[in-house]
Amino acid sequence: MAKEEVLEFPGVVTELLPNAMFRVKLENEHEIIAHTAGRMRKNRIRVLAGDKVLVEMTPYDLTKGRITYRLK
């Protein structure tokens, strides 16, 4: 997948799910299921409920995403 096809949205983590998955509510009121990106796992960045995050999604499946950044 080319990098240009990625959509980025800010959101808030609402729920922690099993297997390092998170339920994220985007600013446009959609709820998706997201997992943390490999660099966040490698650097052991913790994501908790209530954290503001940046989520990458593909235009092909708008129900799943990847958390790439935890906002301050």
Curated annotation (Swiss-Prot):
Keywords: Cytoplasm, Initiation factor, Protein biosynthesis, RNA-binding, rRNA-binding. Residues 1-72 form the S1-like domain. It comes from the Bacteria. SUPFAM superfamilies: Nucleic acid-binding proteins. It is found in: Cytoplasm. One of its GO terms (molecular function) is translation initiation factor activity. GO terms for cellular component: cytosol. Coiled coil: none annotated. InterPro entries: NA-bd_OB-fold, RNA-binding_domain_S1_IF1, S1_domain, TIF_IF1. Gene3D superfamilies: Nucleic acid-binding proteins. One of the essential components for the initiation of protein synthesis. Stabilizes the binding of IF-2 and IF-3 on the 30S subunit to which N-formylmethionyl-tRNA(fMet) subsequently binds. Helps modulate mRNA selection, yielding the 30S pre-initiation complex (PIC). Upon addition of the 50S ribosomal subunit IF-1, IF-2 and IF-3 are released leaving the mature 70S translation initiation complex. Component of the 30S ribosomal translation pre-initiation complex which assembles on the 30S ribosome in the order IF-2 and IF-3, IF-1 and N-formylmethionyl-tRNA(fMet); mRNA recruitment can occur at any time during PIC assembly. Belongs to the IF-1 family. This is Translation initiation factor IF-1. It comes from Brucella canis (strain ATCC 23365 / NCTC 10854 / RM-666).
